[in-house]
Each structure stands twice: as structure tokens, then as C-alpha cells.
């Protein structure tokens, strides 16, 4: 009896050790990626760019966090203590674009998600690996769904409050206010402060309309990252679907997809984008993302097609076919997960490329007219001859593109089995 108990205890201990030592494919790739310090720290640089994009209103906005207005100052209904910054984040008088509303929402939802993630990660040791992975997947899906619903409700609600000039009110000595670090909005126009040199008030000076350049570059981070990510997501989705169909089914499906790819690559991509842009009278950020997404999928499609052609001849796929699994299950459970590694690397480089395309369109005056794009600031610098208006957005574009390319190179090497150390 004692021997049976010892054997059972040994079996449980061996199983626990095996589960603790087990490394998934993602763990292997992550450990390998960490061996490339330049790419690893560049990834954190990209994360910081995203954090800066989210926290832009915390750093620069012409609305105070806190305001205490005494009786007799301003409108009668303004007397008392106010926290206008929190409502201004979703006020369409201050933020017209849905892009800004989305990033402003992340100021509140990201910390909540981070806390939940830490609690979930802390419970990892108490759960079986399969249960932890299931719980993590559900958390990501429910979090994305919840944030999408909240954003849709807020955006469609069209929330507006009566406009209040908080900068003018704060000039009264009896009014107590606490503003962000910079009291400017990227839309503020001050014709009395046109083309000012950098100083303690305007860190990078002002442009032709008196708008603070540093604030516009700060909010321009949102545009660049969003256009890069969303445009790449669009053309990656198209490329994966078409490339997967062509590679798996072959025959006439492959022929049709390849002919479509050949037609698309006959046209220079940038000129094709310019042509499509010409059909839009008043382009928005979403139009630019859609145009880039609809024209950049050919490379992904060819890459996925090649991966599917290689993988469908592998033994594990042939075994799945022999077992009678449905084609949908074979494609989505066995082939596609193994084909997405090179796609991820290509998408990382694609984000940098999309940012450059957007900056080029804005530089040529073909981007959104009201958006604080880095390309627009470059145009102002070219027309006015001010060095800071050229160097500041140029450096921002350079740093962002370099960081993304370094991350892509590290991911490419980490996914290559021949380079594993």
C-alpha cells in the first residue's frame, strides 16, 4: 500500500515538473527574441511610443484637470468646483476624430486591463497550463469586445458640452486651476504667435497658424501608429485569406489569385495610392488607412501561398486528411497557425512602410486636412524654411521607422530555426 502511494506521489511530481518545464512555441520564440538586445529594447521603444500616444491629453490639452471658479466669474452656471478634463476627453468640441476618442478611452481601460492581467498572471502557478491559456484567451477576447462596445457607444453618442474658454478663465487671479504640462490643443490657432522660435512656452515653436508644434507632434504619434497598424491589419487579412485559398486549394483558385496579384503589382504602389486618393474629395484618417490596406496585400498573399504549399505536404497535414478532418479544421487549426510566423515579420516591416506612406501623402498635401500629421508639419517647414519644423517631425518619423524595423529584424531571426542559439 505504501509503495502505491509513493508511486502515485512520484507520478504527480513528475507530471508537475514536466508541465513546469514545458515551453510552448511562443515561449521559445520569445526567449530567442530576447537574445537580440537591439531588437528587444526597440520593442520597448515602440511600447513607449504607444504609451505617449495614449497619454497625449495628460501632457498637452487646453482644459484643466481641476478648476475652482468663484461666484461672479464667468457664466453663472460655472461657479464651483469642476473637473472638465475628464469630460473633455469625449467632448466632440475638443476631439472630433474617432481616433482621438478611442485613444482617450484607453487612458481608463488600459490600467484596468493591466491590473486584471497581473492578477491572471499571478494565478498562473495555481492553474494547469491548459486552463491558464484558456482563461488568458477569454480575457483578451472579452476585453477587446468590451472596449469595442464602449467605444461605439461613446462615438455614436456624439457627446458635446457648451464650450468654455478655460485658458481665459484661468487668467483671473481668483480662479484656481490645475492644467496639463502644456496648455495647448493641436487645433488651437493663435495668429498673434505665428512661426515662433522654441522657448519655455512653446518647446518646439509654433507653425504658420500659431499652433504649438510639440503638441501637434505628440498627437501625431496617434495618427502614425494607428494608420500603420490598421492599414497593415487590413492588407494582412486580405493577403492571408487569398494566399491561403490559393496555396491550399491550388488549381483554378491558385490561378485566379496569382493573376490578380500580377495585375496589382503591375502598378507602382505609391502611384496607385495617389490615384485612389484622387477619387476622395475630403479624405479622413480612415480613408488613408483603407487605401493603404487595399493596395498592399500582394506581398502577404504570395508569402502565405508559399507557406501553404509547403505545409500541406507535411506529414501532420496528410495525417489530418487521412483522419477525415474537415478542410476548415485543417486550414485553421493545423496549417494557418504554422504559416503566420513569416507574416508577422512582414507585418512588422509593413507598419513602418505604412507610416512612411502616410507621411508622404500628408507632405504632398493629400492627407487629412485637420489631422496633426507629421507630414503636414514637414510641409510647413519646407514652405516657411524653419529648421525646427523640418527636424522635429523628421526625427519622429525616423525614430519610429527605425524602431519598427529593428523589431522586425529581431522577430525574423527569432523565427528562423537555423539561427536559434
Regions found by a protein language model. Give the residues of each.
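Gly/Trp-centered helix-boundary motif
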Residues: 1-236, 240, 354, 370, ...
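Alpha-helical transmembrane segments of integral membrane proteins
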Residues: 130, 151, 206-421
Amino acid at each position: 500500500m505504501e509503495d502505491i502511494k509513493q508511486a502515485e506521489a512520484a507520478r504527480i511530481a513528475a507530471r508537475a515538473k514536466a508541465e513546469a518545464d514545458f515551453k510552448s512555441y511562443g515561449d521559445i520564440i520569445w526567449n530567442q527574441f530576447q537574445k537580440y538586445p537591439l531588437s528587444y529594447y526597440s520593442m520597448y521603444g515602440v511600447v513607449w511610443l504607444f504609451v505617449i500616444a495614449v497619454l497625449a491629453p495628460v501632457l498637452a490639452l487646453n482644459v484643466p484637470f481641476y478648476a475652482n471658479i468663484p461666484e461672479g466669474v464667468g457664466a453663472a452656471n460655472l461657479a464651483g468646483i469642476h473637473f472638465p478634463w475628464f469630460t473633455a476627453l469625449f467632448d466632440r468640441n475638443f476631439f472630433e476624430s474617432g481616433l482621438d476618442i478611442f485613444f482617450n478611452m484607453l487612458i481608463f481601460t488600459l490600467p484596468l486591463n493591466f491590473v486584471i492581467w497581473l492578477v491572471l498572471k499571478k494565478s498562473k502557478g495555481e492553474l494547469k497550463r491548459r486552463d491558464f491559456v484558456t482563461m488568458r484567451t477569454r480575457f483578451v477576447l472579452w476585453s477587446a469586445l468590451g472596449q469595442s462596445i464602449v467605444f461605439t457607444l461613446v462615438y455614436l453618442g456624439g457627446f458635446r458640452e457648451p464650450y468654455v474658454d478655460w485658458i481665459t478663465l484661468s487668467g483671473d487671479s481668483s480662479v484656481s486651476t490645475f492644467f496639463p504640462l502644456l496648455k495647448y490643443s493641436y487645433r488651437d490657432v493663435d495668429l498673434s504667435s505665428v512661426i515662433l522660435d522654441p522657448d519655455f512656452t512653446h518647446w518646439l515653436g509654433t507653425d504658420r497658424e500659431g499652433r504649438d508644434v510639440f503638441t501637434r507632434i505628440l498627437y501625431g504619434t496617434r495618427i502614425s501608429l494607428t494608420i500603420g497598424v490598421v492599414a497593415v491589419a487590413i492588407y494582412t487579412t486580405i493577403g492571408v485569406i487569398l494566399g491561403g485559398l490559393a496555396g491550399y486549394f491550388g488549381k483554378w483558385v491558385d490561378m485566379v489569385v496569382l493573376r490578380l496579384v500580377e495585375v496589382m503589382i503591375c502598378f507602382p504602389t505609391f502611384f496607385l495610392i495617389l490615384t485612389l486618393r484622387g477619387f476622395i474629395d475630403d479624405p479622413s484618417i480612415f480613408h488613408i488607412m483603407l487605401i493603404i490596406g487595399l493596395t498592399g496585400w500582394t506581398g502577404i498573399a504570395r508569402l502565405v501561398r508559399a507557406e501553404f504549399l509547403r505545409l500541406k505536404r507535411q506529414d501532420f497535414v496528410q495525417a489530418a486528411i487521412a483522419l477525415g478532418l474537415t478542410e476548415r479544421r485543417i486550414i485553421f487549426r493545423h496549417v494557418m497557425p504554422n504559416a503566420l510566423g513569416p507574416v508577422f515579420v512582414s507585418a512588422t516591416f509593413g507598419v513602418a512602410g505604412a507610416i512612411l506612406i502616410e507621411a508622404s501623402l500628408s507632405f504632398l498635401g493629400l492627407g487629412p486636412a485637420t489631422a496633426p500629421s507629421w507630414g503636414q508639419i514637414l510641409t510647413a517647414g519646407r514652405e516657411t524654411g524653419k529648421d525646427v519644423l523640418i527636424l522635429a517631425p523628421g526625427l519622429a518619423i525616423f525614430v519610429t521607422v527605425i524602431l519598427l524595423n529593428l523589431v522586425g529584424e529581431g522577430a525574423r531571426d527569432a523565427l528562423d530555426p537555423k539561427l536559434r542559439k
